[in-house]
């Protein structure tokens, strides 16, 4: 069968029901003159983007551009998510806030977790190892990864006030100096104005603030309250300085890790691994909203902690202790001195509130993978 006959059969097959008389055959090598039945073949060719001359058709210029833009934005978002998983710490699975260390095989650790691993190994009297590949790690074997530190500093992070995206390296400056929605206080706070609000409302408030026009007698009562608060704060710091003069002082970095109870309705609680301070073994526990049934339904969030002595003691052990933020954390926590006499029968303190500023700070702690704090214990000699 000749090539001409093959073309005719192809045209008939593409247009069933059409007679052969409906097809006009041109010169050899020319195109088939399409009859009524060949419109389907042309339509198929046009839909598939293949022209009759064999070239591939371009994308439809009338396609809505918004869809293409959204696709690109989605791809960028996925790239950021992938970078988060690639650059995160292998221990806490969070992005590093300060220095980044790597083991000899290249696994990344944030400075807080790296120091914590070395401290744990010292307490257990064993060699510290990378949690991923189990190779030995130490300050001499591990080195900083400056490329990762710079990459992490350029990743976008959300401002907690205006909810806009900024590079992590410039986020602190934006939130403290530039953001128009950052929380600020009235300049007349010194004479008792309690106003707090967004920065863009500060000028309007100060123009209407009533405290500058108050009489001296009215201001005296306000200043007395402020003096009492100042005296309490000064007394706290004097007490801390007195404790620092004790003979037996111990401190360590502790890491609260989240767990769930075995109840039918599980409750969130935190517990630290066992640690040694003043030659005794201890554990810290923490609970949310005093273990209420549904803390997720409450807008007010609190954390309370207790210190537990795990060692057996021959005599009563009287101690003062306090919790502060860890060396690489940005938690706003106020020091509060706790006191307890430990014995074999009374080895647990009462739950005391973790002295954080407000529910916003508590939510930051709950959102983190782990809570890193520093514990000081002062043994009182009799």
Curated annotation (Swiss-Prot):
List where the protein spans the membrane: none
Residue ranges of the RING-type zinc fingers?
89-134
Q: Which InterPro entries match?
A: Sina-like_RING (IPR049548), ZFTRAF1 (IPR039338), Znf_RING (IPR001841), Znf_RING/FYVE/PHD (IPR013083)
Q: Where in the cell is it found?
A: Cytoplasm; Cytoplasm, Perinuclear region
Stretches of the chain forming a coiled coil according to its record: none
Identify the keywords attached in UniProt to this record, alphabetized.
Answer: Cytoplasm, Metal-binding, Zinc, Zinc-finger
* Cited CDD domains: CYHR1_C (cd22861), RING-HC_CYHR1 (cd16505)
Its GO CC terms are: nucleus; perinuclear region of cytoplasm
- SUPFAM superfamilies attached here? RING/U-box, TRAF domain-like
State any single GO MF term.
zinc ion binding
Q: Which portions of the chain have biased composition (kind: Low complexity)?
A: 10-22
Q: Where are the zinc fingers (TRAF-type)?
A: 147-203
Task: Decide whether keyword Kinase is in the record.
Answer: no
Q: Which family does it belong to?
A: Belongs to the ZFTRAF1 family.
What protein name applies here? Zinc finger TRAF-type-containing protein 1
Give the source species: Danio rerio
- Taxonomic placement: Eukaryota, Metazoa, Chordata, Craniata, Vertebrata
């Amino acid at each position: 069968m000749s090539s001409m006959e093959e073309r005719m059969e192809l045209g008939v097959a593409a247009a069933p029901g059409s007679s052969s008389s409906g097809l006009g055959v041109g010169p050899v090598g020319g195109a088939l003159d399409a009859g009524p039945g060949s419109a389907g073949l042309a339509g198929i060719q046009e839909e598939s983007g293949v022209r009759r001359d064999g070239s591939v058709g371009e994308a439809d210029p009338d396609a809505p551009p918004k869809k293409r833009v959204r696709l690109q934005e989605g791809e960028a978002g996925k790239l950021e998510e992938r970078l988060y998983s690639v650059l995160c710490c292998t221990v806490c699975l969070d992005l590093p806030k300060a220095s980044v260390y790597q083991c000899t095989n290249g696994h990344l650790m944030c400075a807080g977790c790296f120091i914590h691993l070395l401290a744990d190994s010292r307490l257990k009297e064993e060699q510290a190892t990378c949690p991923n590949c189990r190779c030995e790690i130490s300050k001499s074997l591990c080195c900083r990864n400056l490329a990762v530190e710079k990459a992490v500093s350029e990743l976008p992070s959300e401002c907690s006030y205006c909810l806009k995206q900024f590079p992590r390296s410039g986020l602190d400056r934006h939130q403290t100096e530039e953001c128009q929605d950052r929380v600020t206080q009235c300049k007349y706070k010194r004479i008792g104005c309690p106003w707090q609000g967004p920065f863009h409302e500060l000028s309007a408030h100060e123009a209407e603030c009533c405290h500058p026009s108050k009489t001296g007698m009215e201001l005296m009562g306000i200043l007395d309250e402020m003096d009492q608060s100042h005296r309490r704060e000064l007394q706290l710091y004097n007490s801390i300085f007195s404790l620092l003069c004790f003979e037996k002082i111990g401190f360590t970095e502790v890491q609260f890790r989240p767990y769930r109870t075995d109840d039918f309705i599980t409750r969130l609680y935190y517990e630290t691994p066992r640690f040694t301070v003043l030659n005794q073994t201890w554990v810290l526990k923490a609970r949310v909203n005093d273990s209420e049934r549904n803390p997720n339904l409450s807008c007010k969030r609190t954390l309370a902690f207790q210190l537990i002595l795990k060692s057996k003691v021959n005599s009563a052990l009287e101690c003062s202790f306090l919790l502060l933020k860890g060396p690489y954390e940005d938690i706003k926590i106020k020091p509060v001195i706790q006191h307890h006499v430990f014995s074999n029968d009374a080895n647990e303190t009462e739950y005391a509130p973790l002295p954080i500023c407000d529910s916003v700070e508590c939510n930051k702690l709950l959102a983190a993978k782990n809570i890193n704090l520093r514990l000081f214990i002062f043994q009182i000699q009799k």
